[in-house]
């Protein structure tokens, strides 16, 4: 991602409806995981550290980001253990974390299986990864190019990548679902006129007037409530996966709700 685009994202991280909505969805999923108090947590690709603020209520949080601007921003928020690193080479020991969050990072990596394998390395046995990614390659747009994405995902493609890296699937749900139809129509219209434009691709994340911002956030409030109840949404602009690091190399149970709890660090042998 270009530094100019990254700085723009940092500026809207606190205030944009999309980031607030994604944090709500994450919080809803973490409620279902019943994160034990004191769990060691890693935010992979932590950006400004805003998500680390929320995660720190659950336990000690470490973070890393490839962009030094994000690392500095997270440190300025008071997070001491934030490092400059790539998801393909995480600067932590094997089995260090009960919970790992990886929000809209995998699409930036040329080899997502390698990245998922490295994330699994630093997860403890039974540890959980919560990852979000953009959905549907057919929705590829200037926004993806501006942010140097390699791909968008379907549930099946993310599940295959996770399995290849050794993760057991726990649950998958799409989100940002209500806005999918208008967003798809808009991107189709943009694609049909793209050949007429000479401007470079640019991010579509920008601040909107307060009332519009709140209106756009409202659907994700509803979706977060549904996810908290265990309801999985069949389509959306984004996809959330919960994956578990196998204990003893066995295969996990992918039935609805199976495995949606973290190991208790007080009972762990780590």
What are the language-model segments listed below?
Residues 103-106, 132:
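Residues lining the SAM
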Residues 167-177:
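Conserved S-adenosyl-L-methionine
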Residues 113-128:
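A short glycine-rich, Lys/Arg-flanked "PGG" loop and its adjoining helix->strand segment in the class I
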Residues 182-218:
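C-terminal helical/coil "lid" or tail adjacent to the Rossmann-like core of SAM-dependent
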Residues 11-13, 129-151, 155-163:
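Short, glycine-/aromatic-enriched active-site segment of Class I SAM-dependent methyltransferases
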Residues 1-95, 99-103, 114-116, 210, ...:
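Conserved N-terminal segment of class I S-adenosyl-L-methionine
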Residues 219-256, 260-270:
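C-terminal lobe and adjacent flexible extensions of AdoMet/dcAdoMet transferase-like proteins
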């Amino acid at each position: 991602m270009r530094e100019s685009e990254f700085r723009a994202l940092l500026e809207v991280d606190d205030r944009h409806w999309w980031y607030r909505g994604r944090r709500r969805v994450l919080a809803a999923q973490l409620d279902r995981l019943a994160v034990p108090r004191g769990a060691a947590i890693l935010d992979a690709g932590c950006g400004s550290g805003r998500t680390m603020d929320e995660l720190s209520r659950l336990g000690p949080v470490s973070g890393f980001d490839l962009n030094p601007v994000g690392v500095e921003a997270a440190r300025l928020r008071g997070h001491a253990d934030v490092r400059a690193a790539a998801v393909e080479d995480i600067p932590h020991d094997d089995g260090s974390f009960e919970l790992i969050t990886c929000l809209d990072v995998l699409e930036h990596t040329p080899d997502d299986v390698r990245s998922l394998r490295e994330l699994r390395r630093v997860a403890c046995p039974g540890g959980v990864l919560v990852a979000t990614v953009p959905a549907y390659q057919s929705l590829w747009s200037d926004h993806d190019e501006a942010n140097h994405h390699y791909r968008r995902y379907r549930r099946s493609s993310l599940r295959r990548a996770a399995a290849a890296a050794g993760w057991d699937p726990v649950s998958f749900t799409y989100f940002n679902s209500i806005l999918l139809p208008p967003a798809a129509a808009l991107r189709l219209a943009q694609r049909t006129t793209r050949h007429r434009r000479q401007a470079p691709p640019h991010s579509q994340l920008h601040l909107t007037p307060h009332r519009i911002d709140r209106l756009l956030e409202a659907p994700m409030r509803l979706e977060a409530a549904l996810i908290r109840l265990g309801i999985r949404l069949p389509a959306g602009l984004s996809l959330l996966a919960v994956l578990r690091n196998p204990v003893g190399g066995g295969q996990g149970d992918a039935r609805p709700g199976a495995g949606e709890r973290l190991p208790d660090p007080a009972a762990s042998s780590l």
